[in-house]
Amino acid sequence: MIQPQTHLNVADNSGARELMCIRIIGASNRRYAHIGDVIVAVIKEAVPNMPLERSEIVRAVIVRTCKELKRDNGMIIRYDDNAAVVIDQEGNPKGTRIFGAIARELRELNFTKIVSLAPEVL
């Protein structure tokens, strides 16, 4: 469950290291975001000499949350960290690599480029 002011790790090589959620895209009064939701975030920490810089506002899709994800078959998935992938306006990732495992639900939400770059899909 990601809400405004939540800090997230970045799971790609776009140049950002840490994001802070400032808005959840989708509804005007939505309180929490889950895996597969798009958020507006500000970069809190960045790698030097990369295209993305600190205090830049970006869009990101959430790929891992500490809060459990229940599936229809009864399986529960929980990750060790909150992580997101920086995307552009079309939903394509800005980085060329994805780090760590991601959930299968992203494929159903048409983030197929992120799923294809991921080393492991749970």
Swiss-Prot record:
Subcellular localization: Plastid, Chloroplast
Gene3D superfamilies linked to this entry: Ribosomal protein L14
CDD domains linked to this entry: Ribosomal_uL14 (cd00337)
InterPro entries: Ribosomal_uL14, Ribosomal_uL14_bac-type, Ribosomal_uL14_CS, Ribosomal_uL14_sf
Keywords (A to Z) from UniProt: Chloroplast, Plastid, Ribonucleoprotein, Ribosomal protein, RNA-binding, rRNA-binding
A GO CC term assigned to this protein in UniProt: chloroplast
Disulphide bridges, residue numbers: none
Claim: Cell wall biogenesis/degradation is one of the keywords in the record: no
BP GO terms, sorted: translation
GO molecular function: large ribosomal subunit rRNA binding; structural constituent of ribosome
Major subcellular site: plastid
Pfam families in alphabetical order: Ribosomal_L14 (PF00238)
Highest taxon of the lineage: Eukaryota
Assembly and binders: Part of the 50S ribosomal subunit.
Reported function: Binds to 23S rRNA.
Family recorded in the similarity comment: Belongs to the universal ribosomal protein uL14 family.
Stated name of the protein: Large ribosomal subunit protein uL14c
Gene source species: Atropa belladonna
